Amino acid sequence: MWLVAHPASQGSYWTVVTAEGSATRWQVYDGTVSDKTILQQQAPGRPPVVTSGESEPRLLDHPSIMSRNAGQMMASGEGTSRRMFVATNGDLVIAGDDRFRLPIDAPTDARPAAIGNGTYVVYGDVTGRYQHGALGDTLEPSSLVVVNPTNAEVIARTVLDPPLVFEGLQPLVADLDGDGEPEIVTTIADSENGARIAVYSPAGERIATGPVYGPGWRHQLAAAPFGPDDTTELAVVLKPHVTHTLEYYRLADGDLSVRAPVDGISSHTYGSRNLDGAVAADLDADGTVELLVPTTDRRRLVAVSRTSSDARIQWEWELGGQLTSNLTGVGLDDGGVAVGAATANDVFVWST
């Protein structure tokens, strides 16, 4: 199941897409659910994308040439919006007034991410040389591709040497070191050493690499001012299917180090393409950013926050069943936050 949250004039809108593709939209305000709207049937497996502006939110359709498991996003530049997605043959499609295709040989489940200044990053050059299969299949990307959709051009392409691959569907973009410039956060892996976090510049240059603990995945979740001094840190789950350890990384002077761990966290289900397993926000209006993540049994959500010396679970929400959706949220007009999650039988929305 997928949830998409978006702002409303009062409260928030929630688009709910079931595993079978049935889609509905609801408005949640002041503890009341209203305005149910039935939306067009969606292709199962694809993450839904909702556009909003002055009009009501609109659920984007899926072009016929779009890969079955791909995500899509709207890219803007020079006053024009363009849709970006991966086609069935691995091309990156840029569709606006005109349609362009960039032959980057992307995995068919790859999803672009915005860097800023009109540039975007996506994984490319699919390979079968790493047979882990944690993210839905045994095909992984081996390159990081930076594009400018306005000019429909590739402006940087970083290719990993064998046996390395990128193990992920979408890079994470954030200013990790506080210099005002974005970094591109990825997970790289090989069959001998396992996975580790690798950070790149928008030009595709490797800036830093995190520690390696042996075979197993690293699930990059969010970057936010988690640090006790409000320093930006990166939240990552070490081996979410085995070790279940949340780690906070900090990038400083080219060094990427782990500052605090918390056990008992499972942000991903093995084989799933749903990687949206956390929300970072001030969830209880205490002035501190918490990370909301599932526990190992995926029947509870816990809020983790950093202290001066470690990280701790501050409070939890019981779900009454196993989590079956992504976690997502939206800022409210009153300064609060609405967060949503779903089990097989219920959709929950909490507002602060």
Regions found by a protein language model. Give the residues of each.
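Beta-propeller-forming repeat regions
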Residues: M1-T352
